[in-house]
């Protein structure tokens, strides 16, 4: 492993220094993208002047800038991306994730990770289990068979934040700036690559991370916002393929989804009983009710904002518009990290 790139959001200068100290123990070359620092803010403003900047802060924006920095280095051919809140992390996860694209005897350009979502003897992964899968099945019943829907449904865990790819993928991939990132990446793989260039791999026997609140009272937070962003990502992709949507279709989709999701709640209840896991049916059905409501919210946002462009421009386009940008990005990040390799004292390490 040659480079480690860490994207850091919502951090002031003190928090950035804490992050630098924390990651200083890594023996590999590593840089932190301080997205809220003056250097990267200045570069983002330059992109905004050309209508090329991500419209909002978010996971997709963070990942996009990390991709740009990796491109600017020019010395990396296989790249793996994973979340930083994994509680069950070990080196085997990373090795299994990157191996399919790093092995020169394979011809894969993209690899998606998957894993069981059980922790503390509870069934996890509510958004994937209770939103994505029943939503895809409901869409097929509502608008008919679509190859794209079948493609997304073929992935064991479509919302996994762990994937790897060859360097050539980075220049022309268009990703959303919000929580639709994982679906957006799969959509780009569907559009740009043949099926035999894509794979998925089991990367962990057990996986757990920081859990988000469902946020029943605030659609702008937690799993509620995540669900809206994911629904919008799927709808926009289908619309880009010529599918027509209206409020009446969204009402039918909501009703169909609700029935599908309740059936899945019963399936997971039986799975949990058989495997001696805990599952709260009330919490499960509360999530389903929220996701059903958010289908209508996402549909209204989609219909009310037909010109909204959630995808960030490709790095190829940025490079064409501002040829010096990637080099300036590299310089800015190096400047922010200029003290990163200065070994902190034992006192600094805590």
PLM segments and residue spans:
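Short beta-strand-to-loop acidic/aromatic patch adjacent to the donor-nucleotide binding site
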Residues: 76-85
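Conserved donor-nucleotide/metal-binding helix-loop-beta segment in metal-dependent transferases, i.e.
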Residues: 91-112
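Short beta-strand-to-loop element that shapes/binds the nucleotide-sugar donor at the catalytic cleft/hinge
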Residues: 109-126
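Conserved catalytic loops of nucleotide-sugar-dependent glycosyltransferases that act on lipid-linked
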Residues: 122-228
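C-terminal catalytic/acceptor-binding lobe
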Residues: 179, 183-340
